[in-house]
């Protein structure tokens, strides 16, 4: 079939599964408009609506060809050539769960809200899920925890890091769930942080062939800012750590950073100038981190959109109803791959207060 002779819209089918195709038709003389397909999140720039086949690995869409702009090489040869150089599409989620044990084993009203959020995450089918504030014992998840996780997320591997002595027991802690087809090298870095911070299970890093995925649960400055000086040291050490990773290969960094970077990132900036998470010192620390070569992907995608937050205080029963929130959870990337991000946003967690999950979609 010589498609260049067809002057009317012609349906073409491509088999695409868990991947991305971008600029598959780079004909210099063609009037084809650039398009992207992102793992079933489709943007067809010629406004031809995609039709989802009953076979989900196939997407039908319409392309326009004219005689004057016919390609000089085989249409399907071009597809094959460009398919061979497409990137790696990934969906990643991060969530401060505020007690994994409660979310997995309790039947309290709050636990039921957490379980509903977990079901939402199940449906999103992420490649990697980062979890902060697991609050597990030094021995990590129990057999019961692992059983429930396996029921929720079959075909995922689990790695975790708990708070250990001399740090407090059942405090902080992080965990990754990642699909079993992935084979990262896992490290549990210590960054030379003050006090017991390095023993509190705050960082896990996954190393892949071409990039790092790392998560953090940044220490809170504490009531009365009693930990603010230590927090400032932490911020510098953490920035040094991410920079060292970035020298090797691009970085995707996520977690609860316990800081609202700018006034737009919380509902009531004027009354929180000396509140933990919005002090000048903490904000400056985050600015320094970004200045070391990292991008806040939410702002990169959404610009200065206001009133979008990732955390609402549990102490106030109306904080979420009134949207009196803070944006303190982030997906960061190395600057040089920020343009690969296609989505960075919050995931709806219903009426549950505290943190809501955040999602990143990227083609590396």
What does each of the following model-derived ranges do?
Residues 168-186, 316-339:
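Conserved beta strand-loop-helix elements of the APE1-like EEP
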Residues 104, 191-196, 218-235, 270-275:
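Surface-exposed cleft-lining segments at the edges of enzyme active sites
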Residues 3, 14, 24-25, 32, ...:
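Short hydrophobic targeting helices and cationic amphipathic motifs
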Residues 95-96, 121-141, 213, 241-263, ...:
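Active-site beta-strand/loop signature of hydrolases that rely on acidic residues for catalysis
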Residues 36, 75-150, 160, 166-171:
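N-terminal, active-site-proximal structural segment of metallo-dependent hydrolase catalytic domains
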Residues 135-221:
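Structured beta-strand-rich core segments of catalytic domains in phosphoester-bond hydrolases
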Residues 4-10, 31, 38, 50, ...:
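Intrinsic low-complexity, disordered N-terminal segments enriched in polar/charged/small residues
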Residues 150-151, 236-322, 328:
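Metal-dependent phosphoesterases centered on the DNase I-like endonuclease/exonuclease/phosphatase
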